[in-house]
Amino acid sequence: MQQSPFSTVSGAQAADQGHGKVTFTGSIIDAPCSITPQSIDQTVDLGQISKEALLSGGKSTPRNFSIGLENCSFGSPATKNKVQVTFTGMESAAKNGLLGITGTAKGASVAITQADGQIIKLGVPTKEQVLQDGNNTLSFAAYLQGDGDSTNVVTEGEFQAVTDFTLAYN
């Protein structure tokens, strides 16, 4: 008996031609806006920075990042349509309110700024930003800053700094 080209092959006889798994994760929050998935866990590359640029409190070039809010709904009249962001993390050894770095590099801190360039101190809420129904973008920047005067030693090496953010709607 000849097999038709349209006959099916049982699962036991079929070759594995690829397989995988898709896992869906997330959380439900009590807020007027959802946070975009890209905003929840970000990496901002500050680049390879010359230690000379950091002497006497010098700064690297700011790198932009944002927190995306989507599907915002505030009702009518609008309530809780203003948001403040608080960044937290390990403070710099210089105790300057900036984010401390870990790794082999020393003598510098990460500064986080609002879109207008104003430094955001760790643990201090940003000024309120008014939101619209729909999608919104909260814009920030970060740069590496030397920790002190010309006597402060900046040591080259790799570094990392981690901050968490919290949103508070008003």
Predicted regions located by residue number:
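Mature extracellular/passenger domains of Gram-negative fimbrial/pilin and adhesin proteins
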Residues: 2-170
